[in-house]
Structure formats: C-alpha cells, structure tokens
C-alpha cells in the first residue's frame, strides 16, 4: 500500500484540525516547492528525512529488446533521493520489529 497526497491531506485535517481544502493546498504547495527547486537546478534538503539531488547521466549505448537493434540512450538529467540517517534508522528499526 502507498501513502497518497490525499491521505496526507486527510491526516493534516485529522491531526491539526484545519479544513480539508486548506490541508490539500498545503500538501500541494509542499510538493510544488520541491518541484520548482529541482526544475531550477537546486538540491532539496529535508532535515531528518533526506536529500533530493539532480544527476546528469551521459549518453550511453542501449539495445531495443524487441529487435536487438543498437540505439543510443540520450543524455538526461535525473532526480535521485538519498535518505538521511534518521530516516534509515527508523525504517530499519521498524522493519526489525515485524
């Protein structure tokens, strides 16, 4: 099961008592700030959680799996996420409790 933006907004509504429309706007604004920063080439650091980084990948050779034809995979910029130590520790400890 995955946590959705709608579930995050619902949790804000239940926990903080703000109305659902405002909670949804808060969640959307949070993710839009991350998107905007990444689009403008900035790193996003969320203390205690992790970092979103941009990485440039060079062009490399590839192969069409259906035809076996060699094709170039173009250079591109990708987003990577590196979890912080606190997040890693909490995930590891919750996994060992199961």
UniProtKB/Swiss-Prot annotation:
* Molecular function terms, GO-annotated: DNA binding; structural constituent of chromatin
**Top-rank taxon, per record:** Bacteria
**Where is the stretch described as Disordered?**
49-71
What CDD domains does this protein map onto? IHF_A (cd13835)
Q: Which Pfam families match?
A: Bac_DNA_binding
InterPro entries of this UniProt entry? Hist_DNA-bd (IPR000119), Histone-like_DNA-bd_CS (IPR020816), IHF-like_DNA-bd_dom_sf (IPR010992), IHF_alpha (IPR005684)
Keywords (alphabetical) are: DNA recombination, DNA-binding, Transcription, Transcription regulation, Translation regulation
**Listed GO CC annotations:** cytosol
One Gene Ontology term from the biological process aspect of the record: regulation of translation
How the protein assembles, per its UniProt entry?
Answer: Heterodimer of an alpha and a beta chain.
Function per UniProt: This protein is one of the two subunits of integration host factor, a specific DNA-binding protein that functions in genetic recombination as well as in transcriptional and translational control.
UniProt similarity note? Belongs to the bacterial histone-like protein family.
Q: What is this protein called?
A: Integration host factor subunit alpha
């Amino acid at each position: 099961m995955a946590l959705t933006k709608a579930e995050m907004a619902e949790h804000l509504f239940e926990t903080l008592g703000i109305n659902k429309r405002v909670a949804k706007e808060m969640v959307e604004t949070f993710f839009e700030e991350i998107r905007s920063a990444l689009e403008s080439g900035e790193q996003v650091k969320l203390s205690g959680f992790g970092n979103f980084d941009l990485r440039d990948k060079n062009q490399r050779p590839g192969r069409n799996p259906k035809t076996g034809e060699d094709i170039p995979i173009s250079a591109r910029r990708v987003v990577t996420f590196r979890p912080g130590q606190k997040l890693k520790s909490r995930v590891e400890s919750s996994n060992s409790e199961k």
